[in-house]
Amino acid sequence: MIEVRKEIRIAGFGGQGVILAGIVLGKAASLYDGLYAVQTQSYGPEARGGASRAEVVISDHEIDYPKVQSPDILVAMSHQALLTYMDDLKRGGALIVDPDMVVEAEIEDFIRAREVKYFRAPATRTAEERVGITIVANMVMIGALTEATGIVSVRAAEEAIKDSVPPGTEEKNLMAFQAGRELIMEGSR
């Protein structure tokens, strides 16, 4: 049997919930989809506004090397994150960006040259308009990621969200997740 290993990098800045998004993705894969998953994170010393990155490796076999080297999927929630990490993305990989937070004109050549599957998910705006709070933009991105790539099942993602977010916020986070899925279903490419 061929081993399937997928590497995902979610990046943005502190305060966007990047780390929680990585935790949700890892839990969805390992606890609810029955796969192996490793999640790592890094962030700058700033409480808010500094660089933030979550990485998840998902496999159907035990994971012997937990670091993401060349992600199959990059989720960029800020322009700086996009510029910092886009060159690592595998040829033909999936790139999901918040178009309100990045300068898309700067990456058009990259997308063509690398044959990237490109998805636009205006997570911050969608969180504000559909849920009423921007803090759930990370779950909008998890919804977009789930719908665009199928990396985890919808059910697993929903269970992981309920298991990971602060008590009392489950409904808003699930609304944000669904809104993110709908962005992809509606062709926000």
UniProtKB/Swiss-Prot annotation:
Keyword Hydrolase among UniProt keywords: no
Matching InterPro entries: 2-oxoglutarate_synth_KorC (IPR052554), PorC_KorC (IPR011894), Pyrv/ketoisovalerate_OxRed_cat (IPR019752), Pyrv_flavodox_OxRed_cen (IPR002869)
Domain of life of the source: Archaea
Chemical reaction(s) catalysed: 2 oxidized [2Fe-2S]-[ferredoxin] + 2-oxoglutarate + CoA = succinyl-CoA + 2 reduced [2Fe-2S]-[ferredoxin] + CO2 + H(+)
A Gene Ontology molecular function term of the record: 2-oxoglutarate synthase activity
Pfam families: POR (PF01558)
This protein's UniProt keywords: Oxidoreductase
Enzyme Commission no: 1.2.7.3
Oligomer and partners: Heterotetramer of the KorA, KorB, KorC and KorD subunits.
Descriptive protein name: 2-oxoglutarate synthase subunit KorC
Protein source organism: Methanothermobacter thermautotrophicus (strain ATCC 29096 / DSM 1053 / JCM 10044 / NBRC 100330 / Delta H)
Species classification: Archaea, Methanobacteriati, Methanobacteriota, Methanomada group, Methanobacteria
Gene: korC
